[in-house]
Amino acid sequence: MSKVLTLLFLLGQSSIYFGQLFTLRGTCQITRSYCGGVAPSPEVYAQHIAPQPYSGKILYLKKGLKNSLKQKTIAQAVCDSNGYFSFTVTPGDYCIVQEEHTRSYRSIIQECKSSYLQINADCIKQWWINGLQSLSIKTHTTLKPLEFHQACFTPGDIPCIMYTGPMPP
């Protein structure tokens, strides 16, 4: 009888635990390369390359610790003017991704092919598989800032791509 009561107690506790909702929150920051023109003063340059809140950045949440096309996005968050975002989730394993992670990494490579863009295909593949952040949620969680970089003359904030062409007019 005591084993049955213990089992019922444990089942009750696990259903309460797995029914809970937790908040996953964080911030997004972006840095931008200085892309030429008249050289700015050191103060202006420092301000230009300093991390800024990534307002309007759209993030998606997928189940599992790795990105996969088989896993559909289960939630979306848009960063506010301070770069803050949040998701409400049940306990489990998750992967935070951005729009480019919702299609194949091969399509990203294909879209970025240009005589002036150098693409590190292995780097793109690893970035795509790992997503922006993988985590196991067991309680309310605040992440370290997700950091993005906009390189000169490259599409979006995808890493592993470098522009090698002439300065645009």
Task: Annotate each language-model stretch with its function.
Residues 26, 79-87:
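Glycine-centered loop-to-beta-strand initiation motif
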Residues 10-11:
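Short, linear, compositionally biased motifs with a strong N-terminal bias
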Residues 86-95, 100-102:
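Short Pro-Gly-centered beta-turn/loop motif in secreted/extracellular proteins
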